[in-house]
Amino acid sequence: MQKILVTGATGFVGQHLIEYLKLDGYNIRAISRKLIPGVDTVICDFLEDDIPENALKDIDIVFHLAGYAHDLKNEPGIEQTYQKINVNVTVDLLSLSAKHNVKKFIFVSSAKAGGSPVRGVCAAEKDQNDPAGIYGKTKREAELKILEKGRKSSTHVSILRPALIYGPKVKGNLQLMMQGIKKGWFPPLPETGNQRSMIHVDDVVQALLLLASDQRSNDEIFIVTDGKTYSSRDIYEIMCST
């Protein structure tokens, strides 16, 4: 059975990925700031520590989910934090993966890496629009660097750009919105005609597992959605009905 390394294992997607990998009987290791029950855990804080080289020993596939997404524009040093976590750590982890002959490196990027969406136009992987915001810019920079580096090594790189992810244990704005609706303080949203793509966390996990098993994904970027579009009003009504 293949040995898997997961970063960001305690995050929203990471928790679901770990559950699926356990069910399928994979040998799992995680890099995390805290011990994960039932998982071989290498303790590391990417913001403070170098990546422990022993974390990559005997690993076949890396799922790199860890990233920095907090939009705290006025926080001192915030740009350096984005650069270190989203770019430097990603490149360093791929370098160590190549050194240890890891077969596949799968990077979870973001739809924001493809640039700001154009109303009424379906985004494509080949789009080269300028990403808006430091989060999208650093994710795009990481993509370009690891694709180039991967082509020069024996470690194949695949990149996933998920749309807004929803599902059990969701965090961030969707979590706050659900809490507000349940407690009665979130106001009804009008229909404005805005549209956005989304994807269920289980579908993201299935996409990751497919990238790991299909060689056609080598050195490629993939945008994933659930195939539908939602307005803010749609999301509000769905949450009210659950």
Listing of model-derived features with the role each one plays in the protein:
Residues 74, 179-199, 203, 207-211, ...:
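A conserved pocket-lining segment of Rossmann-fold NAD(P)-dependent short-chain dehydrogenase/reductase
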